[in-house]
């Protein structure tokens, strides 16, 4: 059993998160009203305003929305199996094995959205599909919340299953602490699978959340057009930036197999709720706001937001590509000139290029891109800036987890490395 070095504040912290995240995810959307986002009276009477925008509990659920969410997941599973796929291997597990993964998230995206685009061209912007998503947004979100917690419970109970002699369930080092609340949040089993190929964590890591994010962005864009008769430059930029981000992730699906989500974290509420609810329903907050309150940026505004986006992406993708190229082949001409430090374990840590600037410089680029999404909404509401604040906190927390993991892995070599690469995320500041 793992030690009691709990994550996320231990049983109390994870328990609180599991209680408050679902209502937070709902209320940020409830507060976008026809009179403002939030309505003017919120600042003088927040509790009364929250009460007034709260729908009845029963109205948050519907059978058709639940069936729609189920159909969405079944479709993604079917496309994962049916479409051509790159077969990639994961990292070596503690039993010496390496799992194989079907990587075709990008192809799935192309097939899925090509179909939706074709239907929209044929049926026009009044096609029922788009209005269904926006009119039943809260019900779809509630169904996804229930699904994520139910799936979390199933994989948690399943992690205790007996195994044939000589085999064992491979558990997550951070989700195997012996406390049910904490382990339920973190995820006890590392790589739960159904059959040989259906890796439940891989399925959720990119597909339902990221594709759902773009799906709702487009739905709110159609809503803006049907309501106001135009599509604003701001919502076009939101769609371009966020679709770009998603496509980049889907295209690089095999590279996700070496990230902490896959190699270290178990599959629990944190990843399942995050990918089934938080990403698709919270990350579309900018498009949701702009559907009701269009913002016209003009040429100068567009240029400014584009500059922020391109700067962030150059750092984010440049750093990640450099790291992946070095890991794959240090002799590659693109990275062979980079300086590195060799640890006692034989690992090589980059100390020049992007990775000589900061130890997690890719997080800095990611956060800059988050600013570009929020800036498209102007400065008339704080709600749409929730994303950049939350994302900054997330990256700081992930940085601390990464640092602890690396210090445990490399020991004194990590201290030596930190003296060379002094900054953690933002050079000169942090």
Curated annotation (Swiss-Prot):
Predominant subcellular localization, coarse grouping: membrane
GO-annotated biological processes: ergosterol biosynthetic process
Keyword Transmembrane in record: yes
Binding site for NADP(+): 323, 327, 350, 355, 362-363, 402, 406-410, 417
Protein keywords: Lipid biosynthesis, Lipid metabolism, Membrane, NADP, Oxidoreductase, Steroid biosynthesis, Steroid metabolism, Sterol biosynthesis, Sterol metabolism, Transmembrane, Transmembrane helix
Cited PROSITE patterns: STEROL_REDUCT_1, STEROL_REDUCT_2
Transmembrane segments annotated in the record for this chain: 12-32, 67-87, 109-129, 230-250, 267-287, 290-310, 349-369, 376-396
EC number(s) on file: 1.3.1.70
Pathway: Steroid biosynthesis; zymosterol biosynthesis; zymosterol from lanosterol: step 2/6
GO molecular function: Delta14-sterol reductase activity; NADP binding
Membrane disposition: Multi-pass membrane protein
GO cellular component, one term: endoplasmic reticulum membrane
Catalytic reaction annotation: 4,4-dimethyl-5alpha-cholesta-8,24-dien-3beta-ol + NADP(+) = 4,4-dimethyl-5alpha-cholesta-8,14,24-trien-3beta-ol + NADPH + H(+)
Oxidoreductase is among the record's keywords: yes
Location in the cell: Membrane
Disulfide bonds: none
Pfam family, one: ERG4_ERG24
Similarity section: Belongs to the ERG4/ERG24 family.
Function: Reduces the C14=C15 double bond of 4,4-dimethyl-cholesta-8,14,24-trienol to produce 4,4-dimethyl-cholesta-8,24-dienol.
Name of protein: Delta(14)-sterol reductase
Organismal lineage: Eukaryota, Fungi, Dikarya, Ascomycota, Pezizomycotina
């Amino acid at each position: 059993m793992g030690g009691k070095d709990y994550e996320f504040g231990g049983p109390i912290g994870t328990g609180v998160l599991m209680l408050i995240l679902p209502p937070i995810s709902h209320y940020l959307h409830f507060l976008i009203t026809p009179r403002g986002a939030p309505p003017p009276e919120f600042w003088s009477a927040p509790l009364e305003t929250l009460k007034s925008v709260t729908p009845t509990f029963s109205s948050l659920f519907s059978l058709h929305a639940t069936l729609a969410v189920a159909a969405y997941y079944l479709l993604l599973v079917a496309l994962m199996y049916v479409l051509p796929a790159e077969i990639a291997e994961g990292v070596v597990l503690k039993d010496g094995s390496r799992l194989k993964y079907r990587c075709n998230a990008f192809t799935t995206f192309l097939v899925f959205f090509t179909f939706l685009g074709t239907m929209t061209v044929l049926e026009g912007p009044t096609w029922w599909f788009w209005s269904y998503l926006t009119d039943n947004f809260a019900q779809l979100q509630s169904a996804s919340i229930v699904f994520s917690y139910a799936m979390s419970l199933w994989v948690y109970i399943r992690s205790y299953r007996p195994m044939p002699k000589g085999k064992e369930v491979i558990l997550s080092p951070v989700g195997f602490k012996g406390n049910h609340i904490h382990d339920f949040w973190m995820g006890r089993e590392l790589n739960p699978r159904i059959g040989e190929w259906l890796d439940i964590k891989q399925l959720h890591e990119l597909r339902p959340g990221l594709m759902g994010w773009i799906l709702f962005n487009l739905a709110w864009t159609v809503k803006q057009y049907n309501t106001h008769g135009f599509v604003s430059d701001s919502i076009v930029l939101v769609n371009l930036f966020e679709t770009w981000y998603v496509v980049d992730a889907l295209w690089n699906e095999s590279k996700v197999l070496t990230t902490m989500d896959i190699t270290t974290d178990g599959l629990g509420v944190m990843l399942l709720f995050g990918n089934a609810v938080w990403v698709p329903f919270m990350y579309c907050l900018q498009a949701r706001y702009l559907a009701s309150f269009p913002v016209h940026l003009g040429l100068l505004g567009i240029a400014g937001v584009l500059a922020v986006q391109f700067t962030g992406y150059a750092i984010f993708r440049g750093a990640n590509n450099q790291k992946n190229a070095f890991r794959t082949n240090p002799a590659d001409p693109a990275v062979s000139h980079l300086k590195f430090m060799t640890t006692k374990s034989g690992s090589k840590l980059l100390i020049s290029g992007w990775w000589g600037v900061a130890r997690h410089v890719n997080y800095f680029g990611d956060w800059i891109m988050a600013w570009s999404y929020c800036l498209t909404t102007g400065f008339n509401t704080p709600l749409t800036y929730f994303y950049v604040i939350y994302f900054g906190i997330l990256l700081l927390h992930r940085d601390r987890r990464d640092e602890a993991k690396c210090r445990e892995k490399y020991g004194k070599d990590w201290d030596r490395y930190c003296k060379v690469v002094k900054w953690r995320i933002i050079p000169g500041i942090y």
